[in-house]
């Protein structure tokens, strides 16, 4: 069957489902088998949604799954309702990001009501990703990553940390340095005692120190001493050595020495966009009024 044929069949199923819903509302039907009609309508809406999906009509698929979700709720089938809202969200993601968020939020409300916080956390991440990539609303992405981390805490600390690190990275980009520092220090402290994760701790302390550095050079020095004391392995890391060189260059207001230290580090460990942005912000304070080539190379 071609896409047009699938769409036609889906439209027929939607019409049949609507008839079943209307029939369930009549007085006698309500007394005798009203729920059966609703169950049949649920099944038809779901079949229609899947036909629309095969025809790649994502909005129609999302709408059909939504109708099924509402009827499942009418039947007190919370789990089925949440599942249908998630299916609706996944379909809408391809056509209408805001509607996808609305459906996923509806699913989250049901899961939290059922005490299924880990599943709710997963869907908060999906919403955060839609805000990141489709709607480009970083403040809202941060809020959903924070909520996800909150739900994961205690049950899945690794997943909570991943969400918190997203929050920290965005907070620093938005110049909310204190918030970023607190998260990087917290995650660093959590991971440094874990044999499998402790290698990552140096990265988190490095990022926290850079955030301190942007705000105040003395803060960065004190933070560096604290991190070395907390996590002795940090002292021998390339990140710690770079920080010391940068602090020295900053103290001397030596832009060339600063750039040279960054280039040397970058030749072994490629700098990502976040690190490049933070290092440039620090470099501008060396250049005084922010003049210069605005480059690290």
Swiss-Prot record:
In terms of Pfam families, this protein maps to: SNAP
Subcellular location(s) per record:
Membrane
Q: Which InterPro entries match?
A: NSF_attach, TPR-like_helical_dom_sf
Concerning CDD domains, the annotation shows: SNAP
Q: Which GO terms describe its molecular function?
A: SNARE binding; soluble NSF attachment protein activity; syntaxin binding
**Keyword Membrane found:** yes
Its family remark reads: Belongs to the SNAP family.
Q: What does this protein do?
A: Required for vesicular transport between the endoplasmic reticulum and the Golgi apparatus.
Q: Subunit structure, briefly?
A: Interacts with PRKCABP, and disrupts the interaction between GRIA2 and PRKCABP, leading to the internalization of GRIA2.
Q: What is this protein called?
A: Beta-soluble NSF attachment protein
Q: Which organism is it from?
A: Rattus norvegicus (Rat)
Gene name in the database record: Napb
């Amino acid at each position: 069957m071609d896409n047009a044929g699938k769409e036609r069949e889906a439209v027929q199923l939607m019409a049949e489902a609507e008839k079943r819903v209307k029939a369930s509302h009549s007085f006698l039907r309500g007394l005798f088998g009203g729920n059966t009609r609703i169950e049949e309508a649920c099944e038809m809406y779901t079949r229609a949604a899947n036909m629309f999906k095969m025809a790649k009509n994502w909005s129609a698929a999302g709408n059909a799954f939504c109708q099924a979700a509402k009827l499942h709720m009418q039947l007190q089938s919370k789990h089925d309702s949440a599942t249908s809202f998630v299916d609706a969200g996944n379909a809408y993601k391809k056509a209408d990001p805001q509607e996808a968020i609305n459906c996923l939020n509806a699913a989250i409300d049901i899961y939290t009501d059922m005490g299924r916080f880990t599943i709710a956390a997963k869907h908060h991440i999906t919403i955060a990703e839609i805000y990141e990539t489709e709607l480009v609303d970083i403040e809202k992405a941060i809020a959903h990553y924070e909520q996800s981390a909150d739900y994961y805490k205690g049950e899945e600390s690794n997943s909570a940390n991943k969400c918190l690190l997203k929050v920290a990275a965005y907070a620093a980009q938005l110049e909310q340095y204190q918030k970023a520092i607190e998260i990087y220090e917290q995650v660093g402290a959590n991971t440094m005692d874990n044999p499998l994760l402790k290698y990552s701790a140096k990265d988190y302390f490095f990022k926290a120190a850079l955030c301190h550095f942007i705000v105040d050079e003395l803060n960065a020095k004190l933070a560096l001493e604290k991190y070395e004391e907390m996590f002795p392995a940090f002292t021998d890391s390339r990140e710690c050595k770079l920080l010391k060189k940068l602090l020295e260059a900053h103290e001397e207001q030596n832009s060339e020495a600063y750039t040279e230290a960054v280039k040397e580090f970058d030749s072994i460990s490629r700098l990502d966009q976040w690190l490049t942005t933070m290092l440039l912000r620090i470099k501008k304070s060396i250049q005084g009024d922010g003049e210069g080539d605005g480059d690290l190379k």
